[in-house]
Amino acid sequence: MAENSMYHTHISAKHRWLDLNLKEVWQYRDLIYLFTKRNFVVSYKQTILGPAWIFLTPLFTSIVQAFVFGGIAGIGTDGIPTFLFYLCSNAVWAYFANCLTSNANTFTANAYMFGKVYFPRLTTPISNVISTVIRFGIQMVLVLLFMVYYLFQGTLHPHWLWWLMIPVELVHLGILGMGFGIIISSMTTKYRDLTVLVDFGVSLWMYATPVVYPLSMLGEGWMRTVLQINPVT
């Protein structure tokens, strides 16, 4: 008769600042998949339009911004069609903002699970980022459709080499948003006011980032220098 397999869990103190133990996280990849699936189910549960909101949210936001900032305020977009400029900007900003806000309370929101069973705490932030990447990918389909439309209209002349940087920027913004979110989440366990402050702060941060206006609009003064320090710029 075959002997029963024995599993041993060794728990030890961490001695390094950066001790991610990615090998252990990879062993729990099935759990990351389940958390990612849960995020989608919870987000669109009991909604009439369901996942259609992934398209509708940036679409309506871009229409309003194109009307207000492009039409009324007359802010230029450096030769890019106004609606497409705001659609692309909103998609990228929403990706970063969701990576941050979804992880800003990840430890408090999942505290009931942390106290019952052991699993790498990094699995929940990673699943949040993966969910956001999937939403961004779906929104990029909408962006590409409008790009094709403007290309046929002859009003868009893109620099295709810049598209090669999209995967790099996705990783950069994802890690940045997740990192800020985890730091804030570790602090919200004691200071719950940060939960409200994060939503408010992200809204203000958008206006300190070239989302509703091009960076070239600021010229070469000190304001341009300040905005270039902004990691999301």
Functional labels for PLM-detected ranges:
Residues 1-233:
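Hydrophobic transmembrane alpha-helices and immediately adjacent juxtamembrane helices
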